[in-house]
Amino acid sequence: DLRSMGLFKHYRIVRRWACRTYDLKDADLELLIHFDCIGLFTRKEYMNGTYTYSWDKDRWERLRREGWIVVWRQRNRVTQKYTIYKVSFRCSQLISRIYRILLGDEDLPVSSRNKIIDGNSYSDKVMAKAIYMVNKDKNR
């Protein structure tokens, strides 16, 4: 039973860590998780997938420019009418790491390289305390 596993118990903290560490927005990360589950997709499928997310005109180009979405097959105007995309290896590794952290196979990093642990703001200190609490919880 998924409820007894408590898979989403610490999802918010893990999501905020991933977004802060990799300079993503919450909607970007959730959209990348969605497309990682789909596999291959077109630009039109991307447009259909973004209807439920906040409007961001530059999201597509930003995700491509930063290497989160890559071309799987290029359009050639004769036999392939459109370009097919997929999430990059970097993106799939991030999503796999999020799953491992949620399942308790891996802890959130607490080294000084972590922007949140090393941060000086109040929200960073609160998040750092939450990260330590997540790492202590071995029943996640």
What is the predicted role of each segment?
Residues 89-126:
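Short, amphipathic alpha-helical interaction segments positioned at domain boundaries
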Residues 123-140:
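N-terminal intrinsically disordered, low-complexity, charged/polar
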Residues 30-37:
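Short, locally clustered residues in the helix-turn-helix/winged-helix DNA-binding domain
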Residues 64-77:
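A short, conserved structural fragment
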Residues 21-25, 74-100:
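Short, cationic-aromatic polyanion-contact patches
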Residues 37-50:
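Short acidic, hydrophobic short linear motifs in intrinsically disordered regions
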Residues 50-66:
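Short amphipathic alpha-helical interaction segments
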Residues 1-30:
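Short alpha-helical segments that sit at the start of domains
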